[in-house]
Amino acid sequence: MSSGRIVQIIGAVIDVEFPRDAVPKVYDALVISEGNLTLEVQQQLGDGVVRTIALGSSEGLRRGLSVTNTNEPIKVPVGTQTLGRIMDVLGNPIDEAGPIGEQERMQIHRAAPAYEELAASEELLETGIKVIDLVCPFAKGGKVGLFGGAGVGKTVNMMELINNIAKEHSGLSVFAGVGERTREGNDFYHEMKDSNVVDKVAMVYGQMNEPPGNRLRVALTGLTMAEKFRDEGRDVLLFVDNIYRYTLAGTEVSALLGRMPSAVGYQPTLAEEMGVLQERITSTKIGSITSVQAVYVPADDLTDPSPATTFAHLDSTVVLSRDIAAKGIYPAIDPLDSTSRQLDPMVIGNEHYLVARGVQSVLQRYKELKDIIAILGMDELSEEDKLTVNRARKIERFLSQPFHVAEVFTGSPGKYVPLKETIRGFKGLLAGDYDHLPEQAFYMVGGIDEAIEKAGKLK
């Protein structure tokens, strides 16, 4: 193992000089024994100097300190010993429950599986959330993005999906907290603990208060753990909250390394960095990774380069809308903006497809009529349009649902609605079977039978 010395420190960027015949490779991990800090090589500047990013705080460092090259990229613990544990970007335990005791460590930088190893999936993954199962169904082994601005419910939706899928699906899960609030990480841990599924979840956190190097690499740490489970032939769920913070950490690192920014100040390597991560989140013939990723949308602009780059990699996109949240309809998922590759009669069957498209066409017609209603009022509409508006308003409310994870705040018990029930309810609404019920009966209920029961109480 060769050793060098620090020659320059600028925040999280540290330049280290090595003998010219022992210059570290890009992505090699270097260790500063004093302060126990790990650095990752990003650039070779020539004359034996390498530019590195600190995976931890660089406070207290000084020029001339000795640095040792480990001659390999960062390695993190993998395997069943990681389950039920909380780790940082380097795989060190941060839950005060002793060492991980892993039998194997794997490099966080790996190639994506070869094309011939990949496996397509047609199997649907039922979530129990009406609007998702109906309009943007998830595929087992697929990639899902939850897009939304600040405060429209990305994390709550993700928590509900974890609650519904991780409990129903008896497989293993990996949760990567990338640049999100420490409180949310804490909430998630206790949520898992209370529901007795914590021993099936590995948690990796690089939260908001950490240096950019940690936030940039923590997604890869979580992914490496998920890949190990997949390569053992298991079906694993990977939750990433939040992909935007991964991009943002890349922007910070890119600026610190002195690269020219591209559009909106993002790093010039945005598409490549996203591709490196997303291409590894995939299912092979041995096992599957089903991933759910929250994507923050800056200023509610879906054309921003970061969310726009993420779109290309996903099978299902769930778009959360501020307008729907403002109406008090939760989950605030936009059924017209959200899409899925699975919404195909060959995959989901003809009945489901026709009901989903029927719901979308009624809501689209209502959207078009809103301007006329605002100017002239409901009375000027034709009888057919009046009927469409009334049905659309009922459908809108029926797309809402009480969540298990929000029980503490709402006081109403959460509901898991099976797909068959969802299709039956919306099919009846489109056919006009429930035109006589008041629209308030459809708000915040589970299945259609509950809506009928609620209507009886309202009378």
UniProtKB/Swiss-Prot annotation:
Name where it's found. Answer: Cell inner membrane
The record lists the catalysed reaction(s) as: ATP + H2O + 4 H(+)(in) = ADP + phosphate + 5 H(+)(out)
Q: What's the EC number here? A: 7.1.2.2
- Tell me the leader sequence span: none
Q: Where does ATP bind?
A: G148, G149, A150, G151, V152, G153, K154, T155
User: What InterPro entries has UniProt attached to this entry?
Assistant: AAA+_ATPase, ATP-synt_VA_C, ATP_synth_F1_bsu, ATPase_a/bsu_AS, ATPase_alpha/beta_chains, ATPase_F1/V1/A1_a/bsu_N, ATPase_F1/V1/A1_a/bsu_N_sf, ATPase_F1/V1/A1_a/bsu_nucl-bd
Keywords recorded for this protein, A-Z: ATP synthesis, ATP-binding, Cell inner membrane, Cell membrane, CF(1), Hydrogen ion transport, Ion transport, Membrane, Nucleotide-binding, Translocase, Transport
Q: Which PANTHER family match?
A: ATP SYNTHASE (PTHR15184), ATP SYNTHASE SUBUNIT BETA, MITOCHONDRIAL (PTHR15184:SF71)
User: Quaternary arrangement and interactors, per the entry?
Assistant: F-type ATPases have 2 components, CF(1) - the catalytic core - and CF(0) - the membrane proton channel. CF(1) has five subunits: alpha(3), beta(3), gamma(1), delta(1), epsilon(1). CF(0) has three main subunits: a(1), b(2) and c(9-12). The alpha and beta chains form an alternating ring which encloses part of the gamma chain. CF(1) is attached to CF(0) by a central stalk formed by the gamma and epsilon chains, while a peripheral stalk is formed by the delta and b chains.
What function is annotated for this protein? Answer: Produces ATP from ADP in the presence of a proton gradient across the membrane. The catalytic sites are hosted primarily by the beta subunits.
What protein is this chain from?
ATP synthase subunit beta
Q: Which organism is it from?
A: Cellvibrio japonicus (strain Ueda107) (Pseudomonas fluorescens subsp. cellulosa)
Q: What does UniProt list as this organism's lineage?
A: Bacteria, Pseudomonadati, Pseudomonadota, Gammaproteobacteria, Cellvibrionales
